Structures are given as C-alpha cells and as structure tokens.
Amino acid sequence: MSALRNIPPNRRPGAVSIRDVARRAGVSIATVSRAVNRIPTVDPALAERVWRAINEVGYLPNTQARALVSGRSHMLGLIVSEITNPFFPELVQEFENLAVTQGYEVLIGSTNYSSERTESLIRRMLQRNVDGVAVMTFGIEEDLVQKLVEREFPLVFVDAGPDLPNIRVLKVNYGEGIRQAVQHLAALGHRGIAFITGPLRLRSAVSRRDAFLKSMAELGLIVPAEHIVEGDHTMEGGITSMEQLTALAELPTAVICSNDMTAIGALHALYRTTQNVPQEISVVGFDDIHLAQFMLPPLTTVQMSCKDLATAAVEALRAGIERDHPKAAKTEWHIPTRLVVRQSTAFPRGTLPALIERAAGKRRGVGVD
C-alpha cells in the first residue's frame, strides 16, 4: 500500500494512529487490526474500506506490533542462484509483485551457486523472522537440505526436497519442453543434434541433459559423446562450448542449449566464425527470458515461465504458513514447459527444403547464404 506518500508533511508517521484509521473507515479498532493483519475472516469489502482509509490518513502499520498480534512477520524469503542471468531478476519481480499484493514483504538474496552462502542467507532470513523461504536455486546439496529442513519452518525447493510436512516442492517438467524441441528439429530434418548442458553438479542440469538423451532415443537418433558438452549457464560458457562443437570434424546441424544465456553465447561464437544461424546451424535455448525475442535472429527456446514459478512458489509458501489455506495439505506443484518457435531454427543446410527456401529468398532479394 502507498500510505507513505499520503502522509501530510507536517505530521510524523507516529502521529497518525490506528484510531484515526478506525474513525475514517467507520469501523472498530479491532476490525482495523484484523484487516491489517490479513485475518481471513474479515469481510473483503470491509478490509478494502480499511485499507482505503489507511491510504487516506497516511497510517503506517507497525510491523513489529503486527508480528506480535499475528505471530507472523508477513515477510517471505526468496533465494535465487544469481542476478547476472536475466531469468532470475524476472523471477524475483514476479515473486515480489505477487507477494506484495497478498500482504507480504520479501527479503531477497543470491547464492552465486555457493552452498555456504545459501546457508548464510537462510540464517540471516531466520534472524529477520521470515515466515518461510523459497529456495529457487535449481540445485542444492543434500547435506545443506538436511540442515535447512531441521529448522521446521516452511520451505519451498525446486525439483526435489525431503518428504516432510514443512517442505513443498516445485517440480519442473523439463522433459516436455525439451521433447518438443527435439521433435521440432527432427521434423525440420536435423539428425546431428548436439546439447550444451549446465553445470552437471546441479540436479536441474542433469534432468535437462537426460531429457534430451531420452527424446533423441525415442526418435532413434544417435548422440555421439562429443555432441554433449558441459557448460556453466553463462554467455562465456556458451561461447566456449560452441567453439568446442565447431572444432569437430563433423559439425552438428543443430544445438540445444541448457539455458538462454548459453544460447546467446553460442550465437555470438557462431557469428565470430561466420556460421549463419539458422541457415548453417540451428540454435535452441531454454527459459525464454525477455531478451530472447530480441536476439538476431530471435531465439527459439523452451519456455519455463517465471510467472508460473513465482505463482506456485508464493502459493506453496502460503500453504505452509497459513493453517487455514485451502491447499495446506498439498506438497507438490507442477510447472509446465513448452517450445516457443522463433527464427533461430530452420531446415538443415543442403536439404531440399533448405535449397528451395534459399532460392525463394534470393528471388525476394533477401540475403540467405
């Protein structure tokens, strides 16, 4: 709520009391208190009237007092892997927007893929009395998981977590999106398809690689060992991995990357070696960050929606925090993935459809080489 900008310049925040709010809203002080503390039994129309009055008089609820009354801080912790990958700031924005509209503040931290830093962040969030923490890092060591679950307060993990009452898990269906990507490339005529993984110490990276191998096997397509290259989810790693693939005696005709940052690095490496995308090699990413649609060419990618993840994470935390939440007994949330086809994939070079497309492009005066 934007109460701060409504405070008259000659009045200190403390000078506006809960009594002023009650008087303006025409309700009792107890009703204001229940509305401020998001007690679910308060009539929604009445709660809206209270919050309107709060804005009008410029009242700032005392968060410490709220915590004493409700037994909760109304703060959620959110831990992400890093902030240099645009996927995570997009996820943070979606999570915070949802949490704030539902009456929660958010404390945010990034681990830079360090288990020690993750543990330190959790400890600091506990010191701030957060009601629960979403660990959205897509990979966390088992010994650290055990330390965290012993805290016995609501936790949300991605992909896997212990089967305990305070743990809720967001299970991403990596397989469906990657299967769609492989089938899309195979339908175009690609047979030599390579895969650049993420760091294989991460469970999510292993899941994506295994989904790729399974999808290729389902189509009877062979994957030479040299067509699987371990990356690190960065643009620099994408450049290095793509250079490794272009150095092969037989270049794959398509490459699927473990995330969009890797794919952007791969595009850069191909540009430097004058390999045209998609005329000479097709590239597919994973995540569908906002930047993907503005690449040249626009990146075909597997979408893992930040909004879906954030919505599930906030709902899962609230289910663990609020005893009367309608999904309090639920322990798993499933996150879909799907292929978004743009312009970084095409028929393999030298095939009849590619030759026809090339000829048509030349007739239109389009540079296709």
Please tell me what each predicted stretch does.
Residues 1-12, 56, 97-102, 126, ...:
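Bacterial carbohydrate/catabolite-sensing allosteric modules
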Residues 44, 48, 59-132, 210-214, ...:
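Amphipathic helical "hinge" segments at domain boundaries
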Residues 12, 56-62, 116, 136-138, ...:
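Short gly/ser/thr-rich secondary-structure transition/capping motifs
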Residues 112-115, 136-141, 261:
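Short beta->alpha connector loops
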Residues 77-79, 107, 134, 156, ...:
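Conserved hydrophobic packing residues within short motifs/helices of P-loop NTPase cores
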Residues 1-74, 364-369:
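N-terminal helix-turn-helix DNA-binding module of bacterial transcription factors
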Residues 24, 29-34, 68-84, 94, ...:
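Short beta-strand segments enriched in small/hydrophobic residues
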